[in-house]
Structures are given as C-alpha cells and as structure tokens.
Amino acid sequence: MQTHEIRKRFLDHFVKAGHTEVPSASVILDDPNLLFVNAGMVQFVPYFLGARTPPYPTATSIQKCIRTPDIDEVGITTRHNTFFQMAGNFSFGDYFKREAIELAWTLLTGSVEQGGYGLDPERIWTTVYFDDDEAVRLWQEIAGLPAERIQRRGMEDNYWSMGIPGPCGPSSEIYYDRGEEFGVGGGPIANEDRYVELWNLVFMQSERGEGTSKTDFEILGPLPRKNIDTGMGVERVAFVLQGVHNVYETDLLRPVIDAVAARAPRPYDAGNHDDDVRYRIIADHSRTAAILIGDGVTPGNDGRGYVLRRLLRRVIRSARLLDIEGPIVGDLMATVRDAMGPSYPELVTDFDRIARIAVAEETAFNRTLAAGSKLFDEVASTTKATGAKSISGSDAFTLHDTYGFPIELTLEMASEAGLQVDEVGFRELMAEQRRRAKADAAARKHAHADLTAYRELVDAGPTEFTGFDELSSEARILGIFVDGKRVPVVTHGGDGADRVELVLDRTPLYAESGGQIADEGTISGTGAGESARAAVTDVQKIAKTLWVHRVNVESGEFVEGDTVIAAVDPQWRRGATQGHSGTHMVHAALRQVLGPNAVQAGSLNRPGYLRFDFNWQGPLTEEQRTQIEEVTNQAVQADFEVHTFTEQLEKAKAMGAIALFGESYPEQVRVVEIGGPFSLELCGGTHVHNSAQIGPVTILGESSVGSGVRRVEAYVGLDSFRHLAKERALMAGLASSLKVPSEEVPARVANLVERLRAAEKELERMRLASARAAAGNAAAGAERIGNVRVVAQRMSGGMTAADLRSLVGDIRGKLGSDPAVVALIAEGEGGSVPYAVAANPAAQDLGIRANDLVKQLAAPVDGRGGGKADLAQGSGKDPAGIDAALDAVRSEIAAIARVG
C-alpha cells in the first residue's frame, strides 16, 4: 500500500466517524521554546488547555513533524528520521477511551476492501499505564486481545503530560510484531526492534500540578472535560504494510536513494556501512530540508535557519564522500517533490523557490569546504604526526571563525579521520569571543565605564517602572555616576555635568529594549533642591533590572538620596507609542499578506518611524508592499482597542501570542493585544490606547539586510503626513516643470527617459564612428622606428579602456604583416588615463611584446597594466604624463628594433 493511500484511508476513516479534517500546520509556530512542531497535537494545544474554544468537537489531521535532537544518529541507524508524518485523531470533550480504542482497532485490522489497513490482529500488542485497568478491559472487550499481549508500563513510558501544569493522563501504545527474524519474543517490553510502535493513544483525564521531572508531579484531580489525543506514525505503518525492513525502503525515501545511486560510483546496500550511512543521510535530510524551506525557513546561523543549514551541509558533504561529482541538491529537491508532492502540493507549486534556496546554500558551502578542508587536512595530519588523539580547541575555533566550519562538521570530519576534538577548549574560546563582544557592546553603551561600579545597586533590587500608568513619578536618587565612577553629588557647571548617570528607585522613563528606543524627559529637584534640573538624553538597562538615566545637568545640584520628579516628554512618548504600536500593526499585516512564515527578525521604533526585519527569501513585489500598507492602515482606521495584560507564559502562547524565537521569557509575561485576533504579541513596550492614535502608516521601502532577511521601513503619525506632503509637493513641482497634470507625470518621465537613452545611444554610435575614422587615419600615418611600423597616439577625451582595446586591434589589422605596434592612450572620465597596446606576430618575433610595452606607458602616468604578448591594457591616474608615456614606448621599440 502506497503512503498516499495510507494517508487517505486514515483521514477517510475518521471523517466518516464525524471528525473534521484539519490541514497540517506549518512546522514552525510562534513559540520561542519550540524549535519545530514535533507532534500532531501541537496546533490543538490551546483547545486542550482551555485557552480557546474548539470550533469542532472532534478533529483529524496528518501533521508534518520535525525532530532534530538525534540528527547525528540519522543514517547510522534506520530508526532515526528528522522528518515524519503524524496522523492523529482528537476529541475535545466528546468521546473518550472506548471510542478511541475502537476507532484505532477497526482501522488497523479492518479489511483493505472496507477501507482498513488489513493488519493481522494476532500480531498486534498493546501497552497500557500500570494501573489503567479500564484500558486493559476495553482492549480485551473490543479487540479480544489476550492478557499476555497487553503489557503494563510505568509513567516513563505510558503517562503523558506537557511537562507543565495542565492536562495529563495515561496512554496506550499499539505495537506490531514483525516476526522472529527481527529478534526474540516477549512483547514491546522485551524487544522494540521486533515490536514496532505504530500508534499512541493518550487519554487526557486529569490535571497535573508542579513537579520536578517527567515522572514526579502531583495529580490535582480529574479534568472537567476529558480529551483524546492520538498519534500514528505514517512512515512506520508504511514500512509494515509495504513489507520492507525500514522507512528508507518505503516509497517515500527509496526514490531519493535511487536518485543518489544513479550519480554515485558505488551502489547502496552493497556491504559498505559508511556508504549506506551517507545514502540515508542524503535521503532523510533532503526531505526535511525541502519541507523546511517550503514552510519558510531559510539557511542561517542560529535557530531554525541553522538546523536547515546543517541538514543541507550534511547532504552536500555526504554526496562528496560518495564521490559524486558536481551539484546534486537541485536534483534531490526535484526527487523529493515527485515523491511527496501528492501529499504536500506546496512542494510542487513553490518548487522553484525551494530549489533556488537549497542550491544557493550548496554553492556557498562548496566554497566553504574548498577553503577549510585544506586547513583541516593540515591540522589532522599535524595532530597525528605529534601522536595526539585530539584536534585542539584552538584549531577547531580557527576553522569555525575563519572558514565558517561549524563545530559539528569538524567533529564529523575528525571522527572519519580517527580523531577527537577538544570540544571543551572550543566552547571556552567561543564563550570568550562572546564575552568580548558583549563587553565591547556594553563598553560602547556605557562609555567604557567599569560596570562593577553598579553592582551594589543591581544587587539591591530592580528599578520600579511606572511608565505604563503615568508620565511623571516621584523618585529617590539611589546613585550618581560620572564617567562610570560613583559620586555623592553633581552640580551644574561642574566637571562631568554633561556625562552624568542617575539611578532612581522608580521611573516612568522607558529604557531602550525590545526595539523601542529610550524615552526623553527631565529629572527635577523638589523642596530645597527645587532649582535642580537635568535633561534625560538616554535610558539604558544594566543586568536587565537597573534603569540608568543619562542626563545633562542644566541647573542646580543633585545629591544621592534626594527626592526628585522624573518626567517623560509627553510629545516624545506619544510618538514612541505610535511607532511601537505601528510596528505591531505592520507585523500583523505582513503575516496576513505573506503568511505565518514571515517571522520577525528584529525591529526598531522611535517617534514617527519604525523599522521591521523579518525572515523572507527574495524581495516583496510592489503588489505585496501595497497590500501590506493597505491592511495596516485599514486596521489603524478600525480604531481597535489596545489591551495589555500579564499572563503565564504557557497560557499566553496557547492563546496564540507571538514571541521572538530564541528569546528567553519570564514565567509571567506582558501581552499586547490589538483588535482581538488582529495582533497578539508578547511585549514589554509602551503603546497607544487604540489603533486610530497611530495615525497613517506610510511604507518608505523594503530592502535586504542579510541572507533571507528583509527590512520594511515606515513613517507613522505626523511624520507620515509630512512625508506625504513632501511627496505631493515634489510631484507638483515635477508636473509644473514638465507642463503636464500630476497623474501624467510617470508617463511623461518614462517618455523622456526613453528619448534620453536613445540620444545617448546615438551619441555613442557617433563617437565610435569618429574613433574608427581616426583609427584609419592613424594607420595611414604610421611612423617607422627601425623596421617596425608604429602608431603611438593620444586619443580624444572620453575614451574608455574597452574603446582603446577595440581600436588598437582595428589599427593593428590595417598595418599589414610587417612588424607593427599600436599604443593608444587617452584622458578618460574622472581623471583616469586608460591605455592599450597591440603587437602583431611579426613584431613579437622581434621580441616586442605588448605586455612589456604597457609597463612603459604605465610608469609616467602612475598606472598599472598587464596582458599578453599580443594585447595588453591598463589605467593610470596622472594625465600630465601622457606625452612622456608615448615617448617611453617609442624609445623601448627603438631599443628592441636596433637589437633585432
């Protein structure tokens, strides 16, 4: 039975049983703690947690899943895969154990004619949680399984929870006995190679509390609504039904192996273990890479992008080790498309983009391999010669830092060479590099101050931020610093009064973070110190908890312990909130137009302006850009309420709140919700109260800021109005100058540009015609030096090196077969001095070579040049030396001609 038929029968079975068919989610979700979707139930987590009401009581899906912790084991064994398909059925308070067991049993053992898989009931075993007597009874009643084929296991194997407080419950796993040839009997407990797990049924019936491990937590009581979550491994069912030994022999991966075998000089499964491992790595990783790129991941240096890069690099290197010559990744992507396209149409419709990204990574990595492999070979050879067994951490670091070798590649190559790698030393050097980078960044931020000076205040506790609720707060000065040194008092006009840092116990001034730049404002004295006033120019965080206000003392004095009033410039804050809320709106619009794969990669917002970086391959079309701007402004005009609240991290994620991947978050997070479902993000910044306060959003442009990362820039609010007014005035000026209505300006400009280009072409044609006429005259007036005909001339201005190279060839052809040399030089644009020399075969026979003569031209004009004996060229910088250069050529020819 082909895999696409296995999938179809699964979905048909559950749809007939009243389930709603739900498409697979993307393998990437907005969850900072989840690298990839790795289970079928992930997209349903909000329903299981009760954070959202499910739109259907039961559902079925076949989810794309990726697991990469065991990536190094892929290929070495046939059990590990980085991509797999999890077929599942789910009940949200509808049916429970009996129905779940009945549905699974009838599909597995039902006849092929009736839509089942036709598995032999006598070869099916199950495991249950050790005290789940109900499950044992149901298996006996429904399936007639004898007691010896129902094995009890503990929490480690047969009890499920998410690892946090929430739903939990026992599970029952279904296994298939492959027969005696695969090992000893005794059921799954004895041998999981012979007994293959096909399906896991999870009975969510209880609520768990906090715990210390997977198996150590408190059961708080029964759930008000019991749920079902099941997962059947499509690939495992496929290799059982197709009668093969493992997933690599199924119709999903065997075509990739066959495609590799067609290019490799050595076949698969011919008794060479290392080669077989390489075949399997290529097959597995190619499939996973295609799925990842299809879901919007692009190769990068961290997170999901790094996983993709590592997978592709392992494919490329495995192909090299199989002695496959030339590029192969494009062919592999096509094979994956053909094998999996029926199940995943995006692999077909988006194939050009998928192949382009994969091939670009192959090209780049081949350059890395070429550069670094030579050094690795030298390092490995030296290591062995000294009798050492391990490549030093320093050498591994050099390979990484200089040649871009990831440590995993160095480990892999070292293992093949019979060596180990000092990973500890490597990690220490990497950590030191990161420490230096952080120290440099901190030093730049804090004017190279000694940050240990703030340690006492950091240890005393965090600064209280009051700026969400008020723009002015009474506070106490906890510390005063000048140039990083703590001082008791600072006075206007005193030394360092413009370089002061004040630490307060509380403040309404926002410290730069989360892409939002710091507030501006004032800190003023009270009471006897009323005359003291300082302008706040920046606010930074130290150790994430201590707000440091950089100020310029404008009057009076500040003393540690004084009570002061810290106030935000309200106009600045208004602009900052417009920029930050505008960023959220643009992010939501991007995802609405481009899809969930447009993942945030960074942002900057300040009053009136926002900048948003996101993961995306290739530039946006004009239509996409216009649509993003329109969706954003429609949401702004909708006057959505902006609602902020704190929530448990897991609950917020279950609600669908977007988080930055790779960021660490506390257990309690702040959520910013704009317009209900329109935008929901984890965010600690300041925002408007409703979307209409943002004002218009004008996208200025979109550009690339790195491989797979695009940037959108926009004005918001009054700055957007000003920009539009400026553009309107510019258009009016153009219309006036061109004497056409504004709406006709683009067509008029296009017409003028076309006419200008035509005129430029005609001028170029006339210039070249004039130059060729001059060439004919030059040939006719050639001088003789000895028995050599020589044309050595200064040409008219504006000539390029290409012009001169063409002309010397033309003139040389007109001088006949006698020894002849042509040397032309001109004063080009921008003070450049291009020149070219040609020597015919007869002149070369006398020892006169163009590449020698070009050096004579070069010296007087401060230039350089090179070429071959028949043709050479160059360029200089000093037009004053042109005549001397031509004289030098004539002298050189005369000297050689006399010798000849």
From Swiss-Prot:
It catalyses: tRNA(Ala) + L-alanine + ATP = L-alanyl-tRNA(Ala) + AMP + diphosphate. Binds 1 zinc ion per subunit. It is an enzyme of class 6 (ligase). It is found in: Cytoplasm. Keywords: Aminoacyl-tRNA synthetase, ATP-binding, Cytoplasm, Ligase, Metal-binding, Nucleotide-binding, Protein biosynthesis, RNA-binding, tRNA-binding, Zinc. SUPFAM superfamilies: Class II aaRS and biotin synthetases (SSF55681), Putative anticodon-binding domain of alanyl-tRNA synthetase (AlaRS) (SSF101353), ThrRS/AlaRS common domain (SSF55186), Translation proteins (SSF50447). Catalyzes the attachment of alanine to tRNA(Ala) in a two-step reaction: alanine is first activated by ATP to form Ala-AMP and then transferred to the acceptor end of tRNA(Ala). Also edits incorrectly charged Ser-tRNA(Ala) and Gly-tRNA(Ala) via its editing domain. This is Alanine--tRNA ligase. It comes from Mycolicibacterium paratuberculosis (strain ATCC BAA-968 / K-10) (Mycobacterium paratuberculosis).
